[in-house]
UniProtKB/Swiss-Prot annotation:
Gene Ontology BP term (one): CMP-keto-3-deoxy-D-manno-octulosonic acid biosynthetic process
Gene Ontology molecular function terms on file: 3-deoxy-manno-octulosonate cytidylyltransferase activity
Secretion signal span: none
The reaction(s) this protein catalyses: 3-deoxy-alpha-D-manno-oct-2-ulosonate + CTP = CMP-3-deoxy-beta-D-manno-octulosonate + diphosphate
UniProt xrefs under PANTHER family: 3-DEOXY-MANNO-OCTULOSONATE CYTIDYLYLTRANSFERASE, 3-DEOXY-MANNO-OCTULOSONATE CYTIDYLYLTRANSFERASE, MITOCHONDRIAL
Pathway stated in the Swiss-Prot or TrEMBL entry: Nucleotide-sugar biosynthesis; CMP-3-deoxy-D-manno-octulosonate biosynthesis; CMP-3-deoxy-D-manno-octulosonate from 3-deoxy-D-manno-octulosonate and CTP: step 1/1; Bacterial outer membrane biogenesis; lipopolysaccharide biosynthesis
Pfam families xref list: CTP_transf_3 (PF02348)
Its biological purpose: Activates KDO (a required 8-carbon sugar) for incorporation into bacterial lipopolysaccharide in Gram-negative bacteria.
Keyword entries, A-Z: Cytoplasm, Lipopolysaccharide biosynthesis, Nucleotidyltransferase, Transferase
Protein name (database record): 3-deoxy-manno-octulosonate cytidylyltransferase
Similarity annotation: Belongs to the KdsB family.
Compartment(s) where it occurs, according to its Swiss-Prot or TrEMBL record: Cytoplasm
Length: 251
């Protein structure tokens, strides 16, 4: 099985400007993500950016860059442009890895690609069991429920499924563990163009979850439990400092 990893890396960030180039132990953040993707065994790793500063930094460490439009409204639109510009075949597997996850385990990058390869779905993703009571009711921890074959039934910021009897007894964490969605996706390349040409659905607007568009239009997303739970990504200066400390401790 061969697959390509695309890493969107926008320079502008409201809470952390210049995020892809943030220094972590002497390397820009985007290089850490790139190296994790290489370790996953990807055939090709492409960094998609709309900023020359990011492109220049990637050239320094020998990565591959695809310059994209600054006008995309979503990461998936940027992904579709990469597929078109790089001439990626319709049946090829493309994994979208966020550019702000320098500690993402290579094992789950490969796992989501293998998940899609073993499925008839056009798209695959991963989840982890929720083990924290805070996460159960946290709208930023997106939940996913699946059918018996592992295909997503719904994604929500709400607490799903709602364990009526357990919650009535005051039991939040039960043996019927909820699953938190991890924002890593594998696509069949030809499906990406189909996806971005669909009009946004009412459900995705309500939940602010773009993946609901796929279910709305009757397509499937296969979900597996991740082999490893990835550390949190970098959204704020505080997150960045935490990642720096983790990497410093490892070295």
């Amino acid at each position: 099985m061969s697959f390509t990893v695309v890493i969107p890396a926008r320079y502008q960030s409201t809470r952390l400007p210049g995020k892809p180039l943030a220094d972590i132990a002497g390397k820009p953040m985007v290089q850490w993500v790139y190296e994790q993707a290489i370790q996953a065994g990807a055939q090709d790793v492409i960094i998609a950016t709309d900023d020359q500063r990011v492109a220049d930094a990637v050239a320094v460490f020998g990565g591959k860059v695809c310059m994209t439009s600054p006008n995309h409204e979503s990461g998936t639109e940027r992904l579709a442009e990469v597929v078109q510009l790089m001439g990626i075949a319709d049946d090829h597997i493309v994994v979208n890895v966020q550019g702000d996850e320098p500690l993402i385990p290579p094992s789950i990058i490969r796992q989501v690609a293998e998940n899609l390869a073993a499925s008839s779905a056009p798209m695959a993703t991963l989840g982890v069991a929720i083990t924290s009571e805070e996460e159960v009711f946290n709208p930023n921890a997106v939940k996913v429920v699946t059918d018996k074959e592992g295909y997503a039934l719904y994604f929500s910021r709400a607490t799903i499924p709602w364990d009526r009897d357990a919650f009535a007894r005051g039991e939040v964490l039960t043996e019927h563990s909820l699953m938190r969605h991890i924002g890593i996706y594998a696509y069949r390349a030809g499906f990406i163009n189909t996806y971005v040409n669909w009009q946004p659905s009412s459900l995705e607007k309500i939940e602010c979850l773009e993946q609901l568009r796929v279910l709305w239009y009757g397509e499937k997303i296969h979900v597996e439990l991740a082999k490893e739970a990835p550390p949190a990504g970098v959204d704020t200066p505080e997150d960045l400092e935490l990642v720096r400390k983790i990497i410093a401790a490892k070295s």
